[in-house]
Amino acid sequence: MSNTPYNSSVPSIASMTQSSVSRSPNMHTATTPGANTSSNSPPLHMSSDSSKIKRKRNRIPLSCTICRKRKVKCDKLRPHCQQCTKTGVAHLCHYMEQTWAEEAEKELLKDNELKKLRERVKSLEKTLSKVHSSPSSNSLKSYNTPESSNLFMGNDEHTTLVNANTGSASSASHMHQQQQQQQQQEQQQDFSRSANANANSSSLSISNKYDNDELDLTKDFDLLHIKSNGTIHLGATHWLSIMKGDPYLKLLWGHIFAMREKLNEWYYQKNSYSKLKSSKCPINHAQAPPSAATRKCPVDHSAFSSGMVAPKEETPLPRKCPVDHTMFSSGMIPPREDTSSQKRCPVDHTMYSAGMMPPKDETPSPFSTKAMIDHNKHTMNPPQSKCPVDHRNYMKEYPSDMANSSSNPASRCPIDHSSMKNTAALPASTHNTIPHHQPQSGSHARSHPAQSRKHDSYMTESEVLATLCEMLPPKRVIALFIEKFFKHLYPAIPILDEQNFKNHMNQMLSLSSMNPTVNNFGMSMPSSSTLENQPITQINLPKLSDSCNLGILIIILRLTWLSIPSNSCEVDLGEESGSFLVPNESSNMSASALTSMAKEESLLLKHETPVEALELCQKYLIKFDELSNISNNNVNLTTVQFAIFYNFYMKSASNDLTTLTNTNNTGMANPGHDSESHQILLSNITQMAFSCGLHRDPDNFPQLNATIPATSQDVSNNGSKKANPSTNPTLNNNMSAATTNSSSRSGSADSRSGSNPVNKKENQVSIERFKHTWRKIWYYIVSMDVNQSLSLGSPRLLRNLRDFSDTKLPSASRIDYVRDIKELIIVKNFTLFFQIDLCIIAVLNHILNVSLARSVRKFELDSLINLLKNLTYGTENVNDVVGSLINKGLLPTSEGGSVDSNNDEIYGLPKLPDILNHGQHNQNLYADGRNTSSSDIDKKLDLPHESTTRALFFSKHMTIRMLLYLLNYILFTHYEPMGSEDPGTNILAKEYAQEALNFAMDGYRNCMIFFNNIRNTNSLFDYMNVILSYPCLDIGHRSLQFIVCLILRAKCGPLTGMRESSIITNGTSSGFNSSVEDEDVKVKQESSDELKKDDFMKDVNLDSGDSLAEILMSRMLLFQKLTKQLSKKYNYAIRMNKSTGFFVSLLDTPSKKSDSKSGGSSFMLGNWKHPKVSNMSGFLAGDKDQLQKCPVYQDALGFVSPTGANEGSAPMQGMSLQGSTARMGGTQLPPIRSYKPITYTSSNLRRMNETGEAEAKRRRFNDGYIDNNSNNDIPRGISPKPSNGLSSVQPLLSSFSMNQLNGGTIPTVPSLTNITSQMGALPSLDRITTNQINLPDPSRDEAFDNSIKQMTPMTSAFMNANTTIPSSTLNGNMNMNGAGTANTDTSANGSALSTLTSPQGSDLASNSATQYKPDLEDFLMQNSNFNGLMINPSSLVEVVGGYNDPNNLGRNDAVDFLPVDNVEIDGLVDFYRADFPIWE
């Protein structure tokens, strides 16, 4: 609607109305839009009958829709009448468009467009003047690049407009004057700064100074997950981008992965021979002694000893079954043909992973006729997922079984291959099965008779329909489910026409036999309780598209049942729950109405539609998997609707994916919401929409006017329509205004010829509703494309929308909403949500588009931040925000901004506090601040969809604020490393960090608010628990990642090692200063007391000092508690719980109380036992080839520019550099600039110095372990061979100046010796993995060979300084980690582990002059310090061993939170050992 008053056009409207009274009836047929019929004058001699017909013409009402609905007088004021303003529904005041006023409307639109273009010209001139006045010449050059040309001039039409409206001479003179004024101002500012500038002026100059800084977002935040069968790209907006791009997390991952390699190698070498010694035959000979010569043991021990227990490197050939099947006929085991149940391998393969020792109580008898194989727990050939049965021999011995395999696929092999496929998805080192999680409900335990049917064989259409009749609920329950969907869930996916859909359901299922009653909105409400249990006996599919309608119905039944508030997950966060409660909805419903609603929900809970019903429908009726291989004849509008519903269902009810589809091969039990299958499905939906022509507005096709009344929504369906003579047209009278279309569909020639005016009017309504559905589907697909791009970080499919699409918004449909107010709200939401999508598109263009992201400027990101803040805080209307984006060149008009020229300004995004507190005082969502009287409350219209619409507004706020958090984080990580080189950037980094933290905490709070209110009665989130659960939890998880980054900064200090002290809070020496420990415990106790009073609803200040880490840790613990409870219902919560538990275990501060229990040097181990490989997380348990494909692993080991030589190179200056710091490859990421984090405070330095003194005391006891041999100036633990492992601290070599190195003392680098003392303890990643699987790695060798040649002089000087530092100069400021000097003697009460030496350490010792054998305990102590962060060794072992608390989730899951591919899954054997290159 245009906001321009219509007072000036009132006379013309009246005259046009009077002149149109006596028009010919022939001119009232459907005409093309904009046709001028005023020149056609009817004859004066017309009969009275014709005049009566003329009075029944389709007249457009002049009153607004709301006043007509309320049946009150409307004053017809534009844009909003007084009645709607008084009752608080001005945002819904809607006038139907007059067809004869379209020409005048076009003139008004032209004036508005010219006005907006003039404003844009002014904005562009201001931007150009700012650019030309910039003191930096480089920035001027950058603005002349082709990528930035469209930023200022837009497209060609706007360039022409600039030339037409502004003279070139005046413009040049004006810009010249502005440029001179700007230069004078800059000179004055320089003079004032040189004299004595105050803080405000310096802050302003800093802001102006860095406005034209360029950021390259194509490197740090792009991920490429290299799988064995391909690659997956994940962009900057993906949830893993922070995991990969943050500098602290990169170093942490390097530290963790190196620890993982060491522990994995140690444990592997330790147990490889013990398994061989403890191996026993799986046959219990005590029960069946092989006494006779022919009764020998059926186990082929030669194959057993060579293939089943030996390490991987000794079994290059596929493993075969150890059972000699030729012995079955000798009497040991009865012949297979005697008993059908014996056609299985008699060996329990679960014993293979336990050292071939079967449990005594579970040892099967060889004479047993029971099948004893358990393929759910083990596969015969894990690396290749190969069946252990020799099919060649099996085919010869049992040809009959193989001959019948076509009819019964299960008879091909006695092994259940389905369970093997599930097991094959595990890592190579694990033998656990992927558990089949229980569905989101607990009622899947009940079994339909149809569910026990095997659907492997082909089923006819009649069999499928008969099975579906058994699965579907009774008729009355189906009608209740449909009403619940359209009342609560429909605004989330409004692509259906409610009236038409109910009409189809009546025809297909005969729901109209239930004598429904009609409520105020024209919706059928079943009222007969006697027919409650009337089942579905027949499903009629008269048209081909009805199969898709049936599939949509099944999805609606399933989604609505899952969304019932009683089915939502119970969340109990203890005392903190009260902080996240919001007022309940104030309801005007009576007690009887509430009781009736409760009864309806209890009835619906009893009838769950199984997910197998959808599988049958989409596989046998719709054949959805074959649509991509069939011509467009199978695609119609209903097919597109089903595909959208199917995509929506997969994302919302992800727990059903394990049952519904097996197409995902990501190696995880749950593919998650960032699965590539969703991405491919959306591309198919987009192409189907193009095939149907949805990208063109339906008004462009006049033939639709003659086609739609005959075929309704199946206009593109070329199939023949089945006859259905039993269909009664009168059954649809209560369903819709277009119900009489069914009579015209029977082939009435009179209705199609237009002789019946009633039918003509209803046909016209049907046409408009069809066009309306057309537009809704298209813009919903556009919204899906934007949301997927935001979630995955992938480019949008529908870019520059207006270049190929002219489809109008649904608000352009000429529909009378007086009988369907719900649809009016849907139309308003479509316009608003599309405008919000335009704001998101502007951000995505600058982050994901390579042409812009490679050289995006700071002031552009600042403009995006300011505009998004204005939108979410309600200080600026969404129309103004979109207009500002276009005027500033941040959003091209080709994206669709010009289509919103006639939008209603009052219908905008309400403020978030108004959304949450709406139910407290019964205030309207869009109230203008005035007090509402009781009479106004009585007059207020009871609006449907209000709570659901506000829940959607809530999700939009979360999305916008997540973008604000991401933009601030990008700018923060860009300017934080520049602090040492340019101190002016410290202020910017601090501001961006605080803003990022504020928006991260906002997302965290909103996530908690949602899950704490989903089960409340009359809550804001009624029936939205399934739809909004993942978006809310995902935003909370993203916020937690920034919390982890800040905790690392708060605890670690500067990355370069400046002013940090390598201390271990709990040492092995008795000389350790216990007062420091007591102070740490006291500080921790005080901080815990403060946390009890912590208000989770308040923002966190970065200046909180020492308590910052504790405050943020408390939020992590609460989120972990939340995900632990949600993981029982939602599979995607398991991954987030693992991620949170991982960091909680890692970052937990060690305490004296917990460490002193074990005492002595074994304090760190406690009751810890060596972690089993099967308990490791996937990204820690994988081998080298798997980890190399993980983007996080790639950047973790390549982040700090490595230097060194390969294993065959000679030592340099008496020592060799480790592999992680030995290669200076050109493809590596640039080094980190020396900087200190914004959370680093003076109090941190004070505590570090105090604990450094205590460390100096410990240092005296360990000086003797340095070998000061003149030929080998190598500290203890340094290997002459290089290693790829990262040390616990990796300071940047280039950050130290030559003056510090040549001075002989380095007082500010206390952790310098960590580089030398800890590198040797970390093993070579390549050596470890090579010893395990014997894979050559020539790429690594070449990198080693070229690394020394690329070493910089600074690196050589730095390492020379290391080798010449005498032990006497080591003091409190420059000391060795206690781990690096741990003694080799075992403690008096040490565990058995302390007597074990690392095999890698033995290898190092045999080739080292120091002859040192570090044990595992020394290694753990050595790596307990990560850049000043004191990691509890017990927590470190727990993390590296995998966060797998049996009391946490109640089961062992293979779901991981890092994308580590698995070589065991099916179809990847060809890529195994393919030496895939590592790409950036």
From Swiss-Prot:
Zn(2+) 1 binds at residues 64, 67, 74, 81. The gene is HAP1. Transmembrane segments: none annotated. It is found in: Nucleus. HRM repeats lie at residues 280-285, 296-301, 320-325, 344-349, 386-391, 412-417, 1189-1194. InterPro entries: bZIP_sf (IPR046347), Fungal_TF_Env_Response (IPR051430), Transcription_factor_dom_fun (IPR007219), Zn2-C6_fun-type_DNA-bd_sf (IPR036864), Zn2Cys6_DnaBD (IPR001138). Binds DNA as a homodimer. Interacts with SRO9 and YDJ1. In the absence of heme, binds to at least four cellular proteins, including YDJ1 and SRO9, forming a high-molecular-weight complex (HMC) which results in repression of its activity and dictates its DNA-binding specificity. Keywords: Activator, Coiled coil, DNA-binding, Heme, Iron, Metal-binding, Nucleus, Repeat, Transcription, Transcription regulation, Zinc. This is Heme-responsive zinc finger transcription factor HAP1. It comes from Saccharomyces cerevisiae (strain Kyokai no. 7 / NBRC 101557).
